C-alpha cells in the first residue's frame, strides 16, 4: 500500500486526450468513492487504521484490474477522479448512494 501511495504522489501527467469509458470509468469512480470514504472516515475516527488501509488497497486492486492504462496514467486518472468529486457534502452523498453497488460490482482479483 505504501508503494501505491508513493506512486500516487509521483505520478506524472497523463495524456489529456485519454478517454475512459464504460466499466473502466465506473471502476475509476468507485475507486475514488471508496478511497475518499476511507480517508474521511479515518479523519473522523469512524474508520480504523486497518480498515482505511483495507479500503485503500481495495481501490488499488480495482484500478489495476479494471483500468487498462500504464501505471502512471492510471494514477493520474485516479488523482483527477478524486479532484472531480466536488465538495465534502457532495462526495458524502455520492459515497452513500454508490458504495454498496461499487463493492458488489467491482470485486478485486486477489
Where in this protein do the model-derived segments appear?
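Sec-dependent N-terminal signal peptides
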Residues: 2-12
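Residue-level marker of positions within ordered structural domains that often coincide
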Residues: 10, 35-36, 107
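Processing junctions and N-termini across compartments
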Residues: 10, 24-25, 96
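Sec/Tat signal peptide C-region and signal peptidase I cleavage site
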Residues: 12-18
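Short N-proximal segments of mature Sec-exported proteins
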Residues: 19-69
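Compact alpha-helical subdomains of small soluble proteins
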Residues: 50-110
Amino acid at each position: 500500500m505504501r508503494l501505491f501511495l508513493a506512486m500516487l504522489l509521483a505520478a506524472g501527467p497523463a495524456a489529456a486526450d485519454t478517454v475512459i469509458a464504460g466499466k473502466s470509468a465506473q471502476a475509476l469512480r468507485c475507486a475514488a468513492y471508496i478511497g475518499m470514504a476511507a480517508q474521511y472516515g479515518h479523519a473522523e475516527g469512524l474508520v480504523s487504521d486497518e480498515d482505511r488501509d483495507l479500503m485503500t488497497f481495495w481501490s488499488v486492486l480495482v484500478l489495476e484490474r479494471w483500468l487498462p492504462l500504464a501505471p502512471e496514467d492510471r494514477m493520474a486518472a485516479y488523482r483527477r477522479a478524486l479532484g472531480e468529486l466536488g465538495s465534502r457534502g457532495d462526495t458524502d452523498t455520492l459515497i452513500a448512494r454508490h458504495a454498496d453497488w461499487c463493492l458488489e460490482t467491482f470485486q478485486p482479483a486477489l
